C-alpha cells in the first residue's frame, strides 16, 4: 500500500480540556505524607439518623412561624376577607398542622418499608391517606 501525504484538517469539535482550579492542582500535586487534609465526611445515612434522633427528642415547632402565618392567612382569604386571628389561634393551628404532617409521614414511612424501599414517593403518601380514609 502506497504512503499518502497527510493534510491538516480543521477539528470538528469535541470538548476542550477543562482547566483545573488552583486548589485541585495543589491538592493533587501535594505529597501523600503532608499537605492539604481532606475535609471530614460522615458516611451516608449517619447525619440523617442523627437528625431523626434530634427531632424525635424535640418538641419545638418545625415550620417557621411567619411563613406559616402567611400561608394560613392566604388560605383563610378564600373563605372570608378581612379575618383577624389571635396569636394563640395561629399557634393552635400550627400545632395541629405539624401534628397531622408528622403522623402522615409516619404512616407514609410504613408504606415505604412495606414496599421494601427507603425513599418516600408521592404514591406512598397517597396510599397512606387512602388507608386512613381521607381520600377516596
UniProtKB/Swiss-Prot annotation:
Expressed in testicular cells. GO terms for biological process: chromatin organization; DNA replication-dependent chromatin assembly; nucleosome assembly; regulation of cell differentiation; spermatogonial cell division. The modification Citrulline is found at residues 3, 9, 18, 27. The modification N6-methyllysine is found at residues 5, 10, 19, 24, 28, 37-38, 57, 65, 80, 123. The modification ADP-ribosylserine is found at residues 11, 29. The keyword Repressor does not apply. The modification 5-glutamyl serotonin is found at residue 6. It comes from the Eukaryota. Acetylation is generally linked to gene activation. Acetylation on Lys-10 (H3K9ac) impairs methylation at Arg-9 (H3R8me2s). Acetylation on Lys-19 (H3K18ac) and Lys-24 (H3K24ac) favors methylation at Arg-18 (H3R17me). Acetylation at Lys-123 (H3K122ac) by EP300/p300 plays a central role in chromatin structure: localizes at the surface of the histone octamer and stimulates transcription, possibly by promoting nucleosome instability. Citrullination at Arg-9 (H3R8ci) and/or Arg-18 (H3R17ci) by PADI4 impairs methylation and represses transcription. GO terms for cellular component: chromosome, telomeric region; condensed nuclear chromosome; extracellular exosome; heterochromatin; nucleoplasm; nucleosome; nucleus. The modification Symmetric dimethylarginine is found at residue 9. The modification N6,N6,N6-trimethyllysine is found at residues 5, 10, 28, 37, 57, 80. It is found in: Nucleus; Chromosome. Coiled coil: none annotated. The modification Phosphothreonine is found at residues 4, 7, 12, 81, 108. GO terms for molecular function: DNA binding; protein heterodimerization activity; structural constituent of chromatin. The keyword Transmembrane does not apply. The modification Phosphoserine is found at residues 11, 29, 58, 87. The modification N6-lactoyllysine is found at residues 10, 15, 19, 24, 28, 57, 80. Transmembrane segments: none annotated. The modification N6-glutaryllysine is found at residues 15, 19, 24, 28, 57, 80, 116, 123. The modification N6-(2-hydroxyisobutyryl)lysine is found at residues 5, 10, 15, 19, 24, 28, 37, 57, 65, 80, 123. SUPFAM superfamilies: Histone-fold. Belongs to the histone H3 family. PANTHER family: HISTONE H3. This is Histone H3.1t. It comes from Homo sapiens (Human).
Amino acid at each position: 500500500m502506497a504512503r499518502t501525504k497527510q493534510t491538516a484538517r480543521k477539528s470538528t469539535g469535541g470538548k476542550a480540556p477543562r482547566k483545573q482550579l488552583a486548589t485541585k492542582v495543589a491538592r493533587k500535586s501535594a505529597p501523600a505524607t503532608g499537605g492539604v487534609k481532606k475535609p471530614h465526611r460522615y458516611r451516608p445515612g449517619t447525619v440523617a439518623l442523627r437528625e431523626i434522633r434530634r427531632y424525635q427528642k424535640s418538641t419545638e415547632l418545625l415550620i417557621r412561624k411567619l411563613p406559616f402565618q402567611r400561608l394560613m392567612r392566604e388560605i383563610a382569604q378564600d373563605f372570608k376577607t378581612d379575618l383577624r386571628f389571635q396569636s394563640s389561634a395561629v399557634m393552635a393551628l400550627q400545632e395541629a398542622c405539624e401534628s397531622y404532617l408528622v403522623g402522615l409521614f409516619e404512616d407514609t414511612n410504613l408504606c415505604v418499608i412495606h414496599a421494601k424501599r427507603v425513599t418516600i414517593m408521592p404514591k406512598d403518601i397517597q396510599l397512606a391517606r387512602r388507608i386512613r380514609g381521607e381520600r377516596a
